[in-house]
């Protein structure tokens, strides 16, 4: 993976629905320009001038994990092309992502997931086993 990131100029995620978007987060940690859609969780972790606007679309039919009628983003392909052209014309190979680094640093991960999440679950378990609520 490191070799792929080293050879790349820019990371593009043009998805209709995305959770955190670990590929985009990994690229941001490596200070690559990142193009993402506004629909999903990536914008919570990555600040970039390249956020593609999305309309809403309903899925027309059931698929493996998805049901007809579910709503997803419908990213603007014209805006994607403008962002890609802009990054190319500026010859961007570096973009600082302090928010992403702060959210993914060891100290924050330990606090958010180990102390806050696991710690709270342990408190809930010990309270329930002692008969307290």
Indicate residue ranges for each PLM-predicted region:
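Short hydrophobic beta-strand element within catalytic cores of glycosyltransferases
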Residues: 33-36, 46, 50-53
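Short alpha-helical donor nucleotide-sugar binding micro-motif in glycosyltransferases
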Residues: 3-8
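Aromatic "clamp/platform" in nucleotide-sugar-dependent glycosyltransferases that forms part
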Residues: 16
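A charged, aromatic-enriched C-terminal amphipathic alpha-helix characteristic of glycosyltransferases
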Residues: 71-79, 88-118
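Short glycine/serine-rich donor-binding loops of glycosyltransferases
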Residues: 21-24, 39
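Conserved acidic donor-binding segment of nucleotide-sugar-dependent glycosyltransferases
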Residues: 50-59, 66-77, 87-89
């Amino acid at each position: 993976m490191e070799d792929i990131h080293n050879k790349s100029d820019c990371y593009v995620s043009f998805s209709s629905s995305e959770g955190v978007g670990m590929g985009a987060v990994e690229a941001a940690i490596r200070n690559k320009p990142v193009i993402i859609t506004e629909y999903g969780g990536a914008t919570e972790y990555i600040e970039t001038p390249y956020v593609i606007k999305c309309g809403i679309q309903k899925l027309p039919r059931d698929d493996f994990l998805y049901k007809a009628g579910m709503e997803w983003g419908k990213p603007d392909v014209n805006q994607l092309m403008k962002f890609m052209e802009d990054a190319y014309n500026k010859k961007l190979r570096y973009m600082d992502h302090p928010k992403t680094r702060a959210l993914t640093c060891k100290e924050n991960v330990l606090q958010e997931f180990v102390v806050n999440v696991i710690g709270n679950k342990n408190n809930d378990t010990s309270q329930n086993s002692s008969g307290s609520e």
